[in-house]
């Protein structure tokens, strides 16, 4: 059963502010038909808008996000810092998603978790992954893509911060292990963050 419109409004409002169209992928039938009617391929901005609109209006699954781990790259951090950082990102999230005609994954999501300083950090946005099915068993899938979103952190006084990050996943049926890597400098950034995603 679909959740109330208010939750979807939050998802769309966040993601529409932050999507980075240069990375948008072709979406489903609506986008393709629009391009045919105009007799040309859609532009970057139009393709990004179509991906957001199709995911918003034609989502196929709801998703539960459960943060699983945070790992600070030991090659770029002093031990004194990693010893006191939190690497158990308790939290949860919700999203909606669809597969386009190529079988690729598109999502709008919201998630909140405990950050490195054990403070709450919300993030919301749009996610895309190109999907591969390397085995004869089509239930096993690999994904590679990006997420474009907005996050807010306690140590930045909860000022909205745009983010554009790589994303990869390993999926079996409805369960996915999904992760990103936040690049950075010495004692800053360089964090591997992973979560479980369950479709229902």
From Swiss-Prot:
Its main location: membrane. GO terms for biological process: lipid A biosynthetic process. It is an enzyme of class 2 (transferase). It holds the Pfam family PagP. Its EC number is 2.3.1.251. One of its GO terms (molecular function) is acyltransferase activity. Keywords: Acyltransferase, Cell outer membrane, Membrane, Signal, Transferase. It catalyses: a lipid A + a 1,2-diacyl-sn-glycero-3-phosphocholine = a hepta-acyl lipid A + a 2-acyl-sn-glycero-3-phosphocholine; a lipid IVA + a 1,2-diacyl-sn-glycero-3-phosphocholine = a lipid IVB + a 2-acyl-sn-glycero-3-phosphocholine; a lipid IIA + a 1,2-diacyl-sn-glycero-3-phosphocholine = a lipid IIB + a 2-acyl-sn-glycero-3-phosphocholine. The active site is at residues 72, 115-116. It is found in: Cell outer membrane. One of its GO terms (cellular component) is cell outer membrane. Residues 1-24 form the signal peptide. The record marks 81 as: Role in lipopolysaccharide recognition. Belongs to the lipid A palmitoyltransferase family. HAMAP family: PagP_transferase. Homodimer. Transfers a fatty acid residue from the sn-1 position of a phospholipid to the N-linked hydroxyfatty acid chain on the proximal unit of lipid A or its precursors. This is Lipid A acyltransferase PagP. The gene is pagP.
């Amino acid at each position: 059963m679909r959740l109330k419109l208010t939750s979807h409004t939050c998802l769309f409002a966040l993601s529409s502010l932050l999507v980075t169209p240069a990375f948008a992928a072709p979406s489903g039938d609506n986008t393709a038909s629009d391009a045919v009617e105009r007799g040309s391929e859609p532009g970057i901005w139009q393709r990004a808008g179509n991906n957001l609109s199709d995911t918003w209006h034609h989502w196929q699954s709801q998703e539960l996000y459960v943060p699983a781990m945070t790992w600070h790259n030991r090659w770029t951090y002093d031990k004194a810092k990693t010893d006191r950082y939190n690497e158990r990102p308790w939290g949860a999230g919700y999203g909606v998603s669809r597969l386009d005609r190529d079988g690729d994954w598109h999502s709008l999501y919201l998630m909140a978790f405990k950050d490195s300083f054990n403070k709450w950090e919300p993030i919301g946005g749009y996610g895309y992954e190109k999907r591969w099915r390397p085995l004869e068993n089509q239930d096993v899938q690999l994904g590679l893509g990006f997420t474009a979103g907005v996050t807010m952190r306690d140590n930045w006084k909860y000022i909205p911060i745009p983010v554009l990050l790589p994303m990869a996943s390993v999926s079996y049926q409805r369960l996915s292990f999904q992760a990103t890597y936040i690049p950075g400098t010495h004692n800053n950034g360089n964090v591997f963050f992973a979560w479980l995603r369950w479709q229902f």
